[in-house]
Swiss-Prot record:
GO BP: regulation of pH
Organism the protein comes from: Anaeromyxobacter dehalogenans (strain 2CP-C)
Gene of this entry: nhaA
Location of the protein in the cell: Cell inner membrane
Name of the featured protein: Na(+)/H(+) antiporter NhaA
GO cellular component, one term: plasma membrane
Length: 644
């Protein structure tokens, strides 16, 4: 159901613009070793600043001045470590090797470092040789003096930069953790000294980047809801969620139970996030090409048809027959959390497969809610909703990207859909469709514009004109550049995704997962429980596996060699963790509280069984022979002069 975990859990392959680069490592690898690293300052200082830089990088020369200011501010409390990460410039690697050679030949690294920082970032022909002679180094000949060892040290630093996720220079690590703030001395000093705000920000980022974090929050929220529901406060807890909440004006009002505000209101934000992700996948993501999408699409369709068919086989008719929708969806937060906890037992390609399949799941689940779980349709309000949708589409066509008109019309659309008898969460999906997108920006042009603006402000600062920071025209220009870098749809997704993952879904679990176990809770509802459990635990993996095999046999899809059919079946078993979306559809399908209670128990049991089954199937590692067959032969390559 939620793919934020999936994005954190997998690296993005080339040509995959959906998620940008894969998640970068947060920790320095390897840690600082005073016996190997170049350390400036007290070896036992309590603050450590590590910089990956290049002598041919102009930004590193600016950072050099900032580091000097930090050392003046913090004194003996700070130790500074410089590691080489040569950029793509002709003199970058020779300059790095020169500094390392000076360190090996008489421990003069910092002398060479300062010389190179003063004279760079551009070095004239023969200038590096002149610096080497000034330092008393022997001629640069292969195997002569310290040069061979220096080249090896640069390669080691480049490999360290790769493992630490360094993709630009300079990159800083503070006390072993990646620093992602501004490069000015004040911000770096605040981070080094560990202000409360910085520590809270760092802890929040660490938790959000941990792939199982959303699943963990859902588990905690569910456990709290179940515990309270089965305690002496259970009745009050249930009554609180049923309390009406709304607005009234002049004798007129609009009110809904609190739980309905959660299910119809808050979940609209979630459906907006889902819609934005589906839109991006269909345009530039994993479902943009038939070859990439064929296998997960086939598996997803089989994984929805088979569970629904098994459910209807057990309950073919009657008031409970409408509950088949509870068996067709997957809670990605839990499924991906288990995949991540299994570590390298699960190939990255398998995570990609499951995530793409769930995107199709979500798309169909949205259609199912709209078509099968809406109330009686009011034609006037339906026409009003269509008119609002047309206005939203007009905003898109007019290239209006400001948020307020979309927010206002989105709220109006929600009200029209609610009054029309359709599920109002569809407003989120419609908003996702009409939110503007645009082609990727010309980063070269925008970089030049930003540099021109900032250089003009820098000149004004030197002339003493600026007293209170950049001028208002400069700030407006920088705001316009920033807005152009990211499309409105991407920006909206990036903004709302954490709220959907860490606020909306846990609140939904609190409001809906609290099931009180009472004697006779399942009396007369054994077939309902069996239908849901059978659909999720057996139907999901069976349908996904058979549909995928059929698609491959028919030549419609190709299975990656990185994972075996057994592992695909294990992913199918994990797809049986319905939970949040299953609970949501169950709330629409079973108006009788007793039926809903039994359905919740069945969904809990099925999700638990599916998770255990999937983990057991995926636990065995592939044999070495199978791994050798599955993976392409490694290509020998050396680190190039850019350190990549």
């Amino acid at each position: 159901m939620n793919r934020a975990d999936a994005r954190r859990a997998r690296p993005a392959p080339e040509g995959r613009p959906m998620s940008g680069p894969g998640p970068l490592p947060v920790r320095l690898d390897p840690p600082v070793d005073p016996a190997r690293d170049h350390v400036l300052g007290e070896p036992g200082a309590d603050l450590t600043l590590v910089e990956y830089g290049s002598y041919a990088c102009p930004h590193c020369h600016v950072a050099h001045e900032v580091v000097a200011e930090l050392r003046d501010r913090l004194g003996d409390r700070l130790r500074y470590v410089f590691r080489q990460r040569p950029i793509r410039a002709e003199a970058a690697r020779p300059a790095a090797e020169l500094a390392e050679a000076a360190g090996l030949d008489g421990e003069r690294f910092w002398h060479a470092h300062d010389l190179l920082m003063r004279r760079g970032p551009s070095f004239a022909a023969g200038e590096l040789d002149a610096i080497a002679r000034e330092l008393g180094l022997p001629p640069r000949e292969r195997g002569a003096g310290p040069w061979e060892g220096a080249a090896a040290r640069v390669r080691e630093d480049v490999e360290s930069a790769r493992r630490s996720g360094v993709h630009l220079t300079p990159t800083f690590f503070i006390n072993g953790r990646r620093y992602e703030g501004p490069w000015d001395a004040a911000a770096l000093s605040e981070a080094l000294l560990g202000s409360l705000g910085h520590r809270l920000h760092a802890a929040t980022l660490d938790f959000a980047r941990w792939a199982p974090s959303t699943g963990l929050l859902l588990v905690v929220a569910t456990a709290i809801a179940v515990a309270i529901a089965n305690s002496s406060a259970g009745a009050a807890f249930t009554a609180a969620w049923q309390a009406p909440l709304g607005l009234s004006l002049g004798g007129r009002g609009f009110a809904l139970p609190l739980v309905q505000w959660v299910n119809d209101g808050l979940l609209t934000l979630f459906f907006l996030v889902v819609g934005l992700e589906i839109k991006r996948e269909l345009t530039v993501g994993r479902l943009a090409s038939w070859r990439a999408a064929a296998l997960p699409m086939a598996a997803a369709i089989g994984g929805m048809v088979a569970p629904a068919a098994l459910y209807l086989l057990v309950i073919p008719a009657g008031p409970l027959a409408g509950g088949w929708g509870t068996t067709i969806s997957t809670d990605t937060a839990f499924a991906v959390a288990i995949l991540v906890l299994l570590g390298d037992r699960v190939p990255v390609d398998l995570r990609v497969f499951l995530t793409a399949a769930v995107i199709v799941d979500d798309l169909v689940a949205i259609a199912v809610v709209a078509l099968f779980y809406s109330g009686a349709i009011s034609l006037p309000w339906l026409l009003a909703a269509a008119a609002v949708t047309a206005l939203l589409a007009g905003l898109n066509r007019a290239a209006i990207s400001a948020a307020p008109p979309y927010v206002a019309l989105g709220a109006l659309l929600w009200a029209c859909l609610h009054a029309a008898g359709l599920h109002p969460t569809l407003a989120g999906v419609i908003l996702a469709v009409v939110t503007p997108t645009r082609p990727p920006p010309d980063l070269r042009a925008l970089t030049g514009q930003a540099q021109a603006v900032l250089e003009a402000e820098l000149r004004r600062a030197r002339e003493g004109v600026l007293r209170h920071g950049p001028s208002e025209p400069a700030l407006r220009a920088l705001d316009a550049i920033h807005d152009r870098i990211e499309s409105p749809a991407s920006k909206l997704l990036r903004t709302l995704d954490p709220w959907a993952s860490y606020a909306v879904l846990p609140v939904f679990a609190l409001a809906n997962a609290g099931v009180a176990w009472v004697p006779g809770a399942l009396d007369g509802r054994g077939r309902l429980v069996a239908a849901i459990v059978l659909g999720l635990v057996a139907g999901k993996p069976l349908g996904m596996f058979l549909a995928a095999r059929l698609a491959v046999r028919a030549g419609l899809a190709v299975k990656p060699a990185a994972y075996a059919w057994r592992q695909l079946a294990g992913a199918g078993a994990l797809a049986g963790i319905g939970f949040t979306m299953s609970l949501f559809i169950a709330g629409q399908a079973f108006p009788d509280p007793a039926d809903f209670r039994a359905a919740k128990i069945a969904i809990f049991a099925a999700s638990l069984l599916a998770g255990v089954l999937g983990a057991l199937v995926l636990w065995p590692r592939r044999s070495p022979a199978a791994e050798a067959e599955a993976l392409p032969a490694p290509e020998g390559s050396e680190v190039d002069a850019a350190g990549t």
